[in-house]
Amino acid sequence: GAADFVSKPIEKDRLINSIQTLIGKSENLKICIIEDDENLRFTVKEILEKQGNIVTEASNGKEALIKLNKEENLPDIILLDLMMPIMNGFEFLSQIKDTKIKSIPILVLTGADLDDNDKSFLKNETEKVIHKTDDTVLSIAEEINNVIKRTG
């Protein structure tokens, strides 16, 4: 579950660097990025694809649900933002409860301040919550790597 919540300032490029650090160790994964920040989504996708991974993307939870429900081969991992228009990350997680998508490990990437209810919900519904404000870049890479090791 998503037991650890850390929040210290970090820039997007450090988050991206941490993802790049980890994905260097992993290739041939199918990864779905659900993120409304187009620049961040594009950059992370580019990094993941350069490492030999197959990346699908969606700009909100509704778009992701439509795409994932059409997929025959589901992704190995989902990177999910929480604060998005149309359908946010919490709504996405609620919508997938009784679907095949529920079995996919989900890493939440968020800059949001979470209250105890949010933390409790995410702990039960996701592998890990990684704050976009997380100061420990290495821990971000390690968490993604840990999920990959456990699942594949």
Model-inferred region functions:
Residues E57-I77:
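Acidic, metal-coordinating helix/loop segments flanking the phosphotransfer/catalytic sites
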Residues I10-I19, I47, D118-F121, T133-I148, ...:
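C-terminal output helix
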Residues E35:
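Conserved acidic carboxylate
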Residues A3, E127:
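Short, glycine/charged-rich "phosphate-handling" switch motifs in NTP-dependent
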Residues M84:
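Receiver (REC) domain active-site loop signature in two-component systems and cognate sites
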